[in-house]
């Protein structure tokens, strides 16, 4: 029966004593931990830098713990344009990544603004209703527009988002693109970026979404006219309804849209 190999006073093939070998092993172990620590620190720097700072990642999903009682939902803040005393209140629930919303924003919204809002007939309120399950950038886009609103440029940013929807809607991440758009509309990009790369306005957008759900909104764009669900196939149909509700006679000049 072979004898167990015994530990000798020198390590095989090295000429080193056992004590020296153990010391070298401890030194190598320390070096490994130092290297691992440096690597971990580098990863942390990369992780934080990719998010634009220590504030955390840009919020792209609704907030889970937003209160849903009726009183809280009534505090959902839409973005308003027009006189508060206008006879007709038009509420829009929209998604920045929705193609139909893009068509409405491009062709119908300018007519509403010029012919109804600016004439004192309509007060329009836009609520965010991001269909985040099918439009992965919609929630972030809604937040981005509200970050622009902090600097008084909501509608300018709104228009750019819709005009360039085909570009950003197919990107893997839209954060940097949205920051570029901030510069396009003349925002302080540093302030905008700090807002976007955080959870700022996430609760506000979520409250908009929950309010729409409570009112039965299921798709975008959806509209309420003086509190009643409304559909219209053309701008002219909407204008006729507005004049009717305001008790006024429509102008003789009409549009073909």
Q: Language-model features: where?
A:
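Structural alpha/beta surface segment adjacent to cysteine/selenocysteine redox centers
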Residues: 86, 94-183, 215-218, 248, ...
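Periplasmic c-type cytochrome electron-transfer domains
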Residues: 58-76, 254-255
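Divalent metal-coordination and catalytic microenvironments
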Residues: 90, 157, 192
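Conserved beta-strand scaffold positions in the cores of enzyme catalytic domains, especially
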Residues: 80, 124-126, 229
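C-terminal cap of thioredoxin/glutaredoxin-like
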Residues: 2-51, 58-61, 109, 179-257
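Acidic active-site catalytic centers that drive phospho-/nucleotidyl reactions
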Residues: 92-95, 226
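A short beta-strand-turn-helix
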Residues: 71-88, 116
């Amino acid at each position: 029966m072979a004898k167990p190999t015994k530990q000798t006073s020198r390590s095989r093939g090295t000429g080193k004593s056992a004590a020296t070998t153990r010391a070298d092993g401890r030194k190598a172990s320390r070096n490994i931990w130092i290297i691992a620590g440096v690597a971990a620190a580098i990863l942390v720097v990369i992780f934080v830098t990719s998010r634009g700072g220590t504030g955390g990642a840009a919020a792209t999903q609704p907030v889970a713990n937003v209160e849903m009682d009726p009183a809280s939902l009534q505090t959902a803040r839409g973005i308003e344009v027009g006189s508060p005393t206008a006879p007709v209140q038009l509420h829009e629930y929209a998604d920045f990544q929705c193609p139909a919303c893009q068509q409405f924003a491009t062709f119908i919204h300018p007519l509403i603004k010029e012919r109804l809002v600016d004439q004192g007939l309509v007060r329009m309120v836009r609520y965010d209703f991001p269909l985040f399950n099918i439009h992965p950038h919609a929630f972030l886009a809604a937040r981005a527009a509200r970050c622009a609103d902090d600097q008084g440029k909501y509608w300018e940013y709104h228009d750019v988002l819709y005009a360039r929807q085909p570009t950003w809607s197919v990107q893997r991440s839209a954060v940097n693109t949205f920051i570029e758009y901030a510069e396009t509309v003349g925002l302080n990009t540093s302030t905008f970026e700090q807002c976007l790369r955080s959870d700022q306005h996430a609760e506000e957008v979520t409250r908009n979404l929950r309010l729409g759900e409570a009112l039965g909104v299921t798709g975008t764009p959806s509209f309420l006219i003086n509190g009643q669900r409304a559909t219209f196939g053309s701008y002219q149909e909407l204008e006729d309804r507005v004049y009717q509700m305001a008790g006024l006679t429509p102008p003789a000049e009409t549009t073909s849209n």
